[in-house]
């Protein structure tokens, strides 16, 4: 029989489970037995058990992360030092890269191909063997010989892959960049351009730019999400293939850039990106080239390189004397003129885009372009341009334009521009008297002026031959040294900075018009053969211009847009180009810059 509860009001305590460790206290209340709260010894046991369980879970989680890190295509010395967030980021990026690579043409997924059937266990298939040999013996050498770094972006602008050589050129880590957004490492002013190149934003309205790999221009393009996969090979150079080519310049963060070296953006480096857009899996596979260092002293100069010093408007301020070794022009004929005067018409648009990139980013590499010669033809050049500051004045800047001569003169004796035409020199016949004045002159030293009616009786052909031609710089200096002065012809006006037009001097109001135009009704002879004017030149010509320049190409920089469309020209130019002549017959209006 159970022991009755004590009748006293005191408490009784019973130790349960005696002999099996610590006892559990029980409180005996009248008619009810209540368990007492646990003591400090039991709480410590429960905490220890919880800590052991958490430690076991963390150990198992770390083991899984360690095994996952070993599956990443990274060296063991790097994968063992990764934290959990980096392992997750790199794993997700690697899965996206596998999917991105499988949709390529041809696909990159060589490791996914299993061994052929019937292969003995432990032996590798030919595909795996070739892949291993390529990675060990060729892959690293190719990356070292590229003089740049390879990267792949997805449609969101995140790095799916970037080669480890990025640390050589930018000082950034491959692990840090993989899986990160490219917009975190480029200059804020280049975000819109990268969006256009990826097709995530409509291209800005402007003159079309050929999306060529050899061009340094930033070829704008609309979204290519719905564009089908292109099956054409690169050798065919189909329009659809060229539409996916990308070539542009961006400023990326760099820990190797010296402070204050780049006048445009300190801490950034200009990278030339060339690659191809993926249409099926929208993304970009490209190669990033670093541009030569900004100081000219760090750039080795070879025999085929010519250094120019230009203004921000590409006006030649100085050039080396070795330019005469590769061209038929000397420094005296180039200084003071704009580079646009010597660029081939079909290359003017790309040079203009390179000019814009130079002013925006401070450094640029042009594509291959043709530099016109004085006697006809051209030579192929490629230039590296850098905006440099003046050591004496901090606010003044100029352009160092280093040109690589890539070929000898081609198409000699073939005029492609007006300044390449031979000068028309007025030659008087021996039987004729002295030159006739174009207007009545005041009496000099007792002589009387020739009456106007006597002037009409003279041969008009002699008057028609007298056409003012602008003298070359050498001839101009020779005439100044000799002290001779022509009373009938005014001095040649200074050449404007951004226009290049055919200059025939002040045309005289005679019955015989220049270039043999006897009557206004007769068809005008062709000044230039149609073969000398490519279609792009005819497209650049407007009724007020015969040549191209920044003003005619809508270059709307305030410090460049100084001149108008250019002076009006004789009507002999316009029938050749199929353009209406804006002025009256046989006249030429003097305008600003002429």
UniProtKB/Swiss-Prot annotation:
Q: What SMART domains does this protein map onto? A: HLH, PAS
* PANTHER family tied to this protein: HYPOXIA-INDUCIBLE FACTOR 1 ALPHA (PTHR23043), NEURONAL PAS DOMAIN-CONTAINING PROTEIN 1 (PTHR23043:SF25)
**What sequence ranges are listed for the domain PAC?**
366-409
Pfam families in UniProt: bHLH_HIF1A (PF23171), PAS (PF00989), PAS_3 (PF08447)
bHLH domain mapped to chain residues: 45-98
Organism this protein belongs to: Mus musculus
Protein name in UniProt: Neuronal PAS domain-containing protein 1
Region annotated Disordered, chain positions:
206-237, 427-498
